[in-house]
């Protein structure tokens, strides 16, 4: 055996039980590293075995944190119809000094957590001064974790949840650990028009489902996926940002440019955090932020899970 590798199954990752507050802090620290240029995060590359599916490779390196790894993640929306999860994947963590793998873990949980944490940190820095209502469109796992994470940043906010499946909304309300107040809403437009923060956490959409004209003055819009909004989201918003500008441009071009002038992207959320870009100038600004997911977030969250798993003796040691 050259070196031991710790295998963490989906059950093992769940047993680690990484606190949401810890995940939020990890993502904020990692965004600061990103803003200071202490990272390598090549735009994700992918293959598309089906027209409604993708498999992406996402490598990331955080020199300050001394963390390196790669996530191999698949999104198959049609899996739900046959009782399989729509998002599956693995994260491989490497020793940055030798390159040897040290851990392989299920990546579904950490993907959901880091995505919601990125939205919550974004909201911390870019929301209007008073957040009373948050619209979450989509009551799946992303919707659930967005409620959990955003309630840490906005504990007094009311969450208006929309989903085509009423049972999904009821299940979300039952599963939420925080004291967030959940209000079921039938129509996305109704929820969006009164919300101070809007999260669209549906499955991948091919057609326009949300009009930016519904967004009220001063709101922050957080799409989890690149499609689904009217093409003017990139031109009608007063401020347009992404989690990683190069990756956002690459992704949008690969999708056939569903939005208008993406050159209006001022920078990244991390640029706002480090003071290189002005985010919200006043409470009337409508701000759109495309957090499409960056590998350094996966590596940072996965590393925290790995550290706790080692301390608790979780997982299976395999030879390499």
UniProtKB/Swiss-Prot annotation:
Superkingdom of this entry's organism?
Bacteria
Enzyme Commission numbers on file? 1.-.-.-
Give me the disulphide-bonded residues.
none
What do mutants without this gene show?
Cells lacking this gene show an impaired nodulation efficiency as compared to that of the wild-type strain GR4.
Please name the PANTHER family in this protein's record.
KETIMINE REDUCTASE MU-CRYSTALLIN
A GO molecular function term, named singly, is: oxidoreductase activity
Q: What is this protein called?
A: Nodulation efficiency protein NfeD
Give the family this protein belongs to, as stated in its UniProt record: Belongs to the ornithine cyclodeaminase/mu-crystallin family.
User: Could you tell me which SUPFAM superfamilies the record lists for this protein?
Assistant: NAD(P)-binding Rossmann-fold domains
What does it do? Answer: Seems to be involved in the nodulation efficiency of R.meliloti GR4 on alfalfa roots.
What are the record keywords, sorted?
Answer: NAD, Oxidoreductase, Plasmid
| Native organism | Rhizobium meliloti
List the InterPro entries hit by this protein, alphabetically: NAD(P)-bd_dom_sf, ODC_Mu_crystall, ODC_N
Q: What enzyme category does the UniProt record give?
A: oxidoreductase
> What's one GO-annotated cellular component?
cytoplasm
